[in-house]
Structure formats: C-alpha cells, structure tokens
C-alpha cells in the first residue's frame, strides 16, 4: 500500500493515472514485493513508527544491463538504489535520510564502490535530496511508465 501510494508522488505532472496504475500493478504489488524479498541480490529497508510504515528503500546488488546506465557507471561493483520513498507526512523529516544511510551502508558492506539511481529529470525535489547525500549526475537513461518513455538522470556516489 505504501509503495502504491508514494510512487505517484515522484512521477512527472504529465503522467496519466492509467500509466501510473499500470506501473504499480506490474512492479509494486504485494506479489512483486514477495519476489523482491526472496531475491538474494535485493535488500529492502522499511521505516515505521509504532503503527504504520513511513517509507522504504530497495537496493539491487547487481550490475545493470541497460547500456545507457552502464555508460554512466565506473567499472567495478555497483549497487542500484532502486526505490526510496516516504509517505507525504514524513517529507522533510528524518525518515528519508535514515533510509538513505541504511542504503549507503548496505551497499558499502556488500562491496559496492558505487551506489547509483535513476531519477526523473523533472523531479527536482528528489534530485536535491540525492545531491544532499553526495550523488551527482553521471548520465541519462529512459524509464518506461505505462505506454510512455520518461527521461531520467543517472546519479552516482
């Protein structure tokens, strides 16, 4: 539920409800998260208070296959910060920073020399957050959202 509720917040304003729903159904369902949790190359971190989940992050400890991403990365072990989202009421608080610290630490502990992510080129709020945590733009890639192709930056640290 948190994944489906928070993903649309990162989408460009031009995104249609249908395209967002298609992405959520394909990638953020309970069944997909069960697969993610069972995958030894993934790590999922959850931030919660006493009653509910406030946010989550997911890492993929594997070299990507997308040629655009590969062109933006150095040689050697890398980890993708695939997802990091917090609920709207947690924006501006410490939750996202705590999740980011957990992601950075886990990538380092697994031997990654580089942590990378993709962020929509229009999502300036997220880009500011990533820069604050040491990420810089190192390339571009595309991202399929339903029946549209979005333009992302590849950011690395």
Regions found by a protein language model. Give the residues of each.
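Acetyl-CoA-dependent GNAT
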Residues: 1-13, 18-93, 97-106, 110, ...
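C-terminal "cap" of GNAT-fold acetyltransferases
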Residues: 45, 73-79, 113-116, 120-127, ...
């Amino acid at each position: 539920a948190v994944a489906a509720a928070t993903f649309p917040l990162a989408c460009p304003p031009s995104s249609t409800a249908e395209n967002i729903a298609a992405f959520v159904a394909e990638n953020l369902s309970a069944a997909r998260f069960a697969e993610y949790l069972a995958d030894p190359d993934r790590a999922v971190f959850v931030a919660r208070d006493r009653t509910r989940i406030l946010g989550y992050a997911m890492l993929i400890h594997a070299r990507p296959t997308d040629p655009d991403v590969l062109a933006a990365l150095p040689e050697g072990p890398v980890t993708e910060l695939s997802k990091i989202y917090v609920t709207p009421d947690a924006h501006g608080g410490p939750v996202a920073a705590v999740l980011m610290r957990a992601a950075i630490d886990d990538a380092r502990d697994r031997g990654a020399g580089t942590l990378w992510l993709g962020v929509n080129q229009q999502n300036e709020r997220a880009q500011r957050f990533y820069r604050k945590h040491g990420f810089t733009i190192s390339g571009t890639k595309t991202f399929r959202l339903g029946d549209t192709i979005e333009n992302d930056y590849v950011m690395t640290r």
